Amino acid sequence: MNPKSNPDTIFSAPIDKIGDFTFDERVAEVFPDMIQRSVPGYSNIISAIGMLAERFVKPHSNVYDLGCSLGAATLSMRRHIKQEGCQIIAVDNSKAMVERCKLHVNAYRSDTPVNVIEADIRNIDIENASVVVLNFTLQFLSPEDRYVLLEKIYAGLRPGGILILSEKYVFEDQVSNELLIDLHHDFKRANGYSELEISQKRSAIENVMRPDSKKQHKERFAQIGFSSYDVWFQCFNFGSMFAIK
């Protein structure tokens, strides 16, 4: 059920001047291959997002996929949602991603409607939500915008609603942090990426993706008022957390 893509060769040749990473047409074309080969445990996270949605979704409520890219989490949730009167609102600010996401969503029939929107997730109203997903999205916002968005999500969640937040993590202990970075690079090598590709991708993304520690995430959840929160999945320095209102 996952969308197919061309192989990711974006960083395979030397680039004289490496610009900041953007989710443009080139990335959208190879995104499924890129993320499977770059994010350890990605398929497990996508599958479990559907299971969590099935458990937490309420009838006549909204489900949000903020930073939906090609719609993998949206499709996983839609397959699991059995409640009446629900809709999924999938949002991304990349025109190329949104266009492809609509094609993927429309390729499968479902009783749960999906509204795919091209917009900045910071400007989206969160209302009557039982499930909100931020799947490797928050880390691309400026640090000052993260708290504001999470506050908005909390306000728009129904009591008992869940936020699913997948992120890359930094670790406060330097030895642990370096080991997990090295293991992630080993993972990418095992998936066919060259040293040049790993190095150039890192240079392109380091200015636009600034990950937090698990402690920082938990402190934000507590300050905002979530009643329960924890890590439910981790592989190397990538993982996913839940926060329940």
From Swiss-Prot:
InterPro entries: CmoA (IPR005271), Methyltransf_25 (IPR041698), SAM-dependent_MTases_sf (IPR029063)
Residues reported to bind S-adenosyl-L-methionine: Y42, G67, C68, S69, D92, N93, D120, I121, N135, R202
One Pfam family from the record: Methyltransf_25
Gene Ontology molecular function, alphabetical: carboxyl- or carbamoyltransferase activity; S-adenosyl-L-methionine binding
CDD domains: AdoMet_MTases
Keyword Transit peptide included in the entry's annotation: no
The UniProt record lists the keyword Nucleotide-binding: no
Gene3D superfamilies, per the entry: Vaccinia Virus protein VP39 (3.40.50.150)
UniProt keywords, alphabetically: S-adenosyl-L-methionine, Transferase
Annotated EC: 2.1.3.-
GO biological process: tRNA wobble uridine modification
Quaternary structure and interacting proteins, as annotated: Homodimer.
Protein role: Catalyzes the conversion of S-adenosyl-L-methionine (SAM) to carboxy-S-adenosyl-L-methionine (Cx-SAM).
Family recorded in the similarity comment: Belongs to the class I-like SAM-binding methyltransferase superfamily. Cx-SAM synthase family.
Annotated protein name in UniProt: Carboxy-S-adenosyl-L-methionine synthase
Species of origin: Vibrio vulnificus (strain YJ016)
Name of the encoding gene: cmoA
